[in-house]
Amino acid sequence: MNLYHNFLIGGLAAMMTMGNAMATEHNDLTGYREGAKVIQVKPSRNQIDAISGIVYSQIATARETRPLHMSLLIPRTEAPKPAIIYFPGGGFTSANHDKYIQMRMALAEAGFVVAAAEYRIVPDTFPAPVNDGKAAVRYLRQHAETYGVDPARIGVLGDSAGGWLVQMLGTTQGETAFDRGDFTDKSSDVQAVATIYGISDLLNIGEGYADNIQKVHQSPAVTEALLVHGPAFREFAGASIMDDTVKARHASPMGHLSNSKPPFLIMHGDKDSLVSPHQSAQLFDALRKAGEKVDYVVVKGAEHGDLTWYQPEVIQEVVSWFTRELKPDTGVLADQSARSNDNL
């Protein structure tokens, strides 16, 4: 009994001694009070600044001037960084550039300046979205120093209709007819293209689907027809995408495969019921046949725009690919003193 008693007293004394030692150690911390939790953190990631409401282009019409907006995520590092411009999907009827924040933030944390840009949609017709996409690239090059961008390393990322747009940016490099607006002395070329369940040929979006779905894509009211021909108005009764195949092919990435292309990452879900997986397969086949650098990822079980595309495995696939192609400098943290004034 005495042995147990002595052991208990000794243990309590040791704990009190240890506690007093820790309290003495923490008393050296400015602002410390007994009972406070103390942690120590080693910085391993950079601060990311967000800028919104940037007007990258102004479209003049007979009635008004329409601004097109861009937002930016900028890692606070010293060296110029590669940039990626995200163009959102929306079936050619919307272009909400606030989407896909998980992907955009992951890219910013990997060391990229990440822009997200809206573009003109139906009832505006082709080539308006392509003109806008190229204008966004030129704007970023023009303001590269302001935003810490390396103008020689600009990639583009898009999903669905945004995937069509970035494919067009990659396949029409050197076709200056699409360069309209400001800063036309700057190149609109891009150094990497990542397309997620994008459209490569407006003439066969429903390839492999049931006959009734393929017939829908021959309607004058379907969005690809509206993109190419515009809506019915006055004497114009509207037109099917099949009514002018030359025009439709000119508005498709598959119609611009003659020149050399930047590296492509193509991703598609095998269960996509909105944009046929054949759209990505045919682009992959064509680029590979032409000897271009292209990677193709089929995501098993993925539908069009479902939650699969927001999971870490998909996001990491995209981040890793852009990292290989554009090589951001992720090893240098910003000077802590340089940011102190912003935190006051």
Please give the residue ranges for each predicted region.
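N-terminal cap/lid segment of alpha/beta-hydrolase-fold proteins
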Residues: 26-78
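Mobile cap/lid helix-loop segments that gate and shape the active-site cleft of serine hydrolases
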Residues: 43-46, 210-256, 262, 289
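Primarily recognizes the serine-hydrolase "nucleophile elbow" in alpha/beta-hydrolase
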Residues: 57, 135-213
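Short beta-strand element of the alpha/beta-hydrolase
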Residues: 70, 80-91
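Acidic catalytic loop of the alpha/beta-hydrolase fold
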Residues: 93, 202, 271-275
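Catalytic nucleophile-loop/oxyanion-hole region of alpha/beta-hydrolase
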Residues: 95-103, 115-151, 308-314
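Short beta-strand/loop motif that positions the catalytic acidic residue
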Residues: 260, 266-268, 272
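Catalytic active-site module of serine/aspartate enzymes centered on a nucleophile-bearing elbow/loop
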Residues: 311-344
